[in-house]
Amino acid sequence: MKTKLFYSFLTFALFLVINSAFGQEHTATLICDVQALNNDTPASEACYFAEEEDVNPIDFTIEANIGDEILWSGETDADGNTIQIKKIKFERGTEVFNSSEKEGTSTIVRTVRFSTKNKPDYKYTISFKINDTGRLYKIDPKVRVGGGG
């Protein structure tokens, strides 16, 4: 009995080690022109992701695998304005996380659970604030998940 319990524990521990060894972290850092946002420029024109500065944030796509973590954060600008990521919410396509939305205070981390392979990409809304006050802004990028992990 002790041997069976030992091997069960060993198998579980090995699974955790393998899963964490192969899971990667993907970061999506949102940068915005705060003055443009304050002048009613749409977030899709006033913001971009640091990882792909030349891509419209609506077209920004995170390529991930099952088991990977995705971290969304905002960057502080030269004037000290901070971007707080408040919510990641599923809109359409293929759900890749365990729940349809997650709220946060400044950053949000989610672990990919399901694949979009041969299915529509995960389309979601990022809701964010500037300096944690006032208006809530939104951008709608996507996640594409392969079958790995």
Task: List the model feature ranges, each with a label.
Residues M1-E25:
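Bacterial Sec-dependent N-terminal signal peptides
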Residues G23, E101-S106:
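Short, ordered beta-strand-loop transition motifs
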Residues E25-I66:
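N-terminal edge beta-strand
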Residues E25-T27, E69, T82, K123:
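Exposed beta-strand and adjacent loop surfaces of beta-rich binding modules
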Residues I31, S73-E75, S127-K129:
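Residue-level recognition of well-ordered beta-strand positions that form the cores
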Residues A36, T76-A78, D132:
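Short, acidic/polar linear motifs in exposed loop/turn regions
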Residues I58-E103:
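Contiguous segments within soluble domain cores/interaction surfaces
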Residues G104-G149:
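Extracellular/periplasmic metallocenter environments
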